[in-house]
């Protein structure tokens, strides 16, 4: 039986800002550029009490808390702290799979320290993070990645939670299905329409029914409802693609997709910055009202070096590539693929320096 730990830094970007500027401590801090189409990168726990969340439009965050202090992201500083945290991880195991700057999976089945209890390993890691970075982290401990990720949210901030193999069903079955990664608002609504509200409800449905309604994701739902996740922790797995998608409650015409594409371009760009790599190919994904998936891509001579460039290419793909204009669409996605390491200094400065919001 594997011992998997999911470590998630608490309000990471905002916490770094509060650590480095005592004047921000105890105040609602929002890490974001200002602008009509900017999104929140992170919110301090004080800001979260007003309902502010990551990926929320910055203008909405400002409406929710007019007194919030907006701080532009400093990704170079966040990456430096992230490297400190990863060095701590590697003291305990070489099986470390970073998901972003602020979270990672660790397989501690055979911890370097010789510690047998995964809970003790997680506690020591969190203590070392606190002592060496003055930041807090939460952890989930479980037999697989799926359960460990859910568990890491259970005692936030600055806590940890374990799901023992013998307690998987007792923990999982009462959960709302929207706690399953990948089940957003639209999917949650579709499941509710089928009478599926909890994981226990989901487990009652046969695989064939779930696949009929949700395609390949139906198989994932079937397995997650049983606590099954056989994915290994993949050490330092390099990101090959990043994307963001929107599923609509009502199907939209092609010419109504522009604002969604602009917002998704920013979300994808923010996620790309966390990888410290360059994405060279822009990918547009569309799902029609009859569930047909269309993808279009373009690889420019120079990779996109701003969210604006990414958005412009994605928008151009809807206009310059033959698409059925009379068709209505239920999903749009914007992504980057063909990733490589940042080597050119000028490109690195363009990619990871100051990023103005789309105007």
Curated annotation (Swiss-Prot):
- Pfam families according to UniProt: IMS, IMS_C, IMS_HHH_1
Family recorded in the similarity comment: Belongs to the DNA polymerase type-Y family.
EC numbers for this chain? 2.7.7.7
Q: Which CDD domains match?
A: PolY_Pol_IV_kappa
Please list the reactions this protein catalyses. DNA(n) + a 2'-deoxyribonucleoside 5'-triphosphate = DNA(n+1) + diphosphate
Q: Name the source's superkingdom.
A: Bacteria
Name of the protein described by the UniProt record: DNA polymerase IV
**Its Gene Ontology molecular function terms?**
damaged DNA binding; DNA-directed DNA polymerase activity; magnesium ion binding
Name the cofactor(s). Mg(2+)
* Chain positions recorded as Mg(2+) binding sites: 8, 102
Which keywords label this protein? Cytoplasm, DNA damage, DNA repair, DNA replication, DNA-binding, DNA-directed DNA polymerase, Magnesium, Metal-binding, Mutator protein, Nucleotidyltransferase, Transferase
List the subcellular locations.
Cytoplasm
Write down the species: Xanthomonas euvesicatoria pv. vesicatoria (strain 85-10)
For this protein, what does the record note about how its cofactor is bound? Binds 2 magnesium ions per subunit.
Checking InterPro entries in the record gives: DNA/RNA_pol_sf, DNA_pol_Y-fam_lit_finger_sf, DNA_pol_Y-fam_little_finger, DNA_polymerase-Y, DNApol_IV, IMS_HHH_1, Rev_trsase/Diguanyl_cyclase, UmuC
The record's note on quaternary structure and interaction partners says:
Monomer.
Query: Which purpose does this protein serve, as stated in its record?
Result: Poorly processive, error-prone DNA polymerase involved in untargeted mutagenesis. Copies undamaged DNA at stalled replication forks, which arise in vivo from mismatched or misaligned primer ends. These misaligned primers can be extended by PolIV. Exhibits no 3'-5' exonuclease (proofreading) activity. May be involved in translesional synthesis, in conjunction with the beta clamp from PolIII.
Site for Substrate discrimination, residues:
13
> Entry's Gene3D superfamilies?
3.30.70.270, 3.40.1170.60, 5' to 3' exonuclease, C-terminal subdomain (1.10.150.20), DNA polymerase, Y-family, little finger domain (3.30.1490.100)
**A biological-process GO annotation:** error-prone translesion synthesis
Indicate the segments forming the UmuC domain, all copies: 4-184
Per the record, GO CC terms?
A: cytosol
Q: Which PROSITE patterns does the record associate with it?
A: UMUC
Active-site residues, record numbering mapped to chain: 103
């Amino acid at each position: 039986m594997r011992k998997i730990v999911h470590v998630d830094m608490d309000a990471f970007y905002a916490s770094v800002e509060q650590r480095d500027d005592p004047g921000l401590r105890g105040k609602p801090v929002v890490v974001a550029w200002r602008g009509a189409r900017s999104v929140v990168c992170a919110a301090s726990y004080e800001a979260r009490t007003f309902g502010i969340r990551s990926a929320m439009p910055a203008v909405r965050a400002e409406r929710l808390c007019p007194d919030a202090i907006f701080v532009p992201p400093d990704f170079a500083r966040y990456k430096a702290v992230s490297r400190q945290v990863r060095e701590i991880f590697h003291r305990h195991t070489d099986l470390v799979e970073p998901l972003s700057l602020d979270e990672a999976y660790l397989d501690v089945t055979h911890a370097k320290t010789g510690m047998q209890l995964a809970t003790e390993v997680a506690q020591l890691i969190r203590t070392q993070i606190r002592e060496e970075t003055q930041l807090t982290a939460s952890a989930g401990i479980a037999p697989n990645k799926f359960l460990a990720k859910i568990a890491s949210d259970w005692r936030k901030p600055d806590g940890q939670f374990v799901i023992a193999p013998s307690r998987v069903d007792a923990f999982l079955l009462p959960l709302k299905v929207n706690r399953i990664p990948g089940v957003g608002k639209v999917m949650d609504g579709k499941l509710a329409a089928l009478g599926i509200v909890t994981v226990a409800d989901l487990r009652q449905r046969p695989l064939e029914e779930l696949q009929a309604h949700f395609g390949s994701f139906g198989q994932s739902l079937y397995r997650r409802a049983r606590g099954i996740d056989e994915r290994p922790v993949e050490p330092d797995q390099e990101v090959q693609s990043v994307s963001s998608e929107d599923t609509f409650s009502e199907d939209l015409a092609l010419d109504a997709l522009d604002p969604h594409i602009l917002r998704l371009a920013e979300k994808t760009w923010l996620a790309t910055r966390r990888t410290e790599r360059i994405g060279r190919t822009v990918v547009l994904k569309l799902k029609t009202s009859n569930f047909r998936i269309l993808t279009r891509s373009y690889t420019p001579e120079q990779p996109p070096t701003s969210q604006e460039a990414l958005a412009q290419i994605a928008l151009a793909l809807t206009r310059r590539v033959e698409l059925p204009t009379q068709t209505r669409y239920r999903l749009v996605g914007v992504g980057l693929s063909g990733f490589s390491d940042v080597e050119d200094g000028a490109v690195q400065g363009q990619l990871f320096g100051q990023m103005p919001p789309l105007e």
